[in-house]
Amino acid sequence: MRKIIFIAFWAMLMIMPAVGQVTFGVRAGGAYSSLVQKVEGTYNAGARFGFSLAGLADIHLYKGLSLRPELAFVNQGGSFYSNPQVEGAKNSFNKCSYYSIQVPVNLAYTFIINDVQLGVYAGPALDFSLFGKMKTENQNVDIHFGHTKEADLKTFDLGVNVGLRVDYSRYFFSVSALCGTLDRRAIEREGESSLYQNNVTLSLGYMFR
């Protein structure tokens, strides 16, 4: 996992000199984080509040078009049921909080309105989970990512990220939604539903222009 993060970071650095103007920045914000599953035909989202800290770059491509990669440290998680659709099995309600490295690579377009810049962006996001805790059956246990035990989650996720950003001078406000596309369960029994991580993040940031 560390090798993958290292390769992704150096790939970002190699792209930057090959293009035009590059501006760096930082952001910090709160996240409404949820784990989504389908229970008895309806989608349930067990949510919690987390945070997101990131370094980012704005790589100008053409006119209002730019590439915006990020390297973020994220606290996320949520709650979900084990065995909700397995006949004769005991249902377990699980709450988890864990930390991840996320690497969104967004394509953005910016509209200039007087002194304000309004931008929209979208792109894929890689998620590498590091460590965390899960409360299940009145016990707090460590999450061992990549293991195949009942209380564990998968290490890797691939998400789709969309967002809106407003810049004024060197400061900006952004709201983004990230939807995971891969099942996070380490073990999925017959009849169990898939489990997906979703986040909505509100951030304040600063660009070093």
Residue ranges and their predicted role:
Residues 20-54, 207-209:
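Short glycine/proline- and aromatic-enriched beta-strand/turn motifs that initiate or cap beta-hairpins
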Residues 21-23, 64, 166-172:
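Short glycine/proline-enriched coil/turn segments at helix->beta-strand junctions
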Residues 51-55, 101-105, 118, 158-164, ...:
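Hydrophobic, lipid-facing positions within transmembrane beta-strands of outer-membrane proteins
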Residues 29, 33, 54, 127, ...:
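Short, electropositive, low-hydrophobicity segments enriched in small/polar residues
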Residues 22, 28-30, 58-134, 200-209:
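Gram-negative (and chloroplast) outer-membrane scaffold detector with strong preference
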Residues 167, 172-182, 187:
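A hydrophobic membrane-anchoring alpha-helix module
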Residues 34-47, 76-100, 127-161, 181-199:
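Extracellular/periplasm-exposed beta-strand and loop segments of Gram-negative cell-envelope proteins
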Residues 1-27, 204-208:
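Bacterial Sec-dependent N-terminal signal peptides
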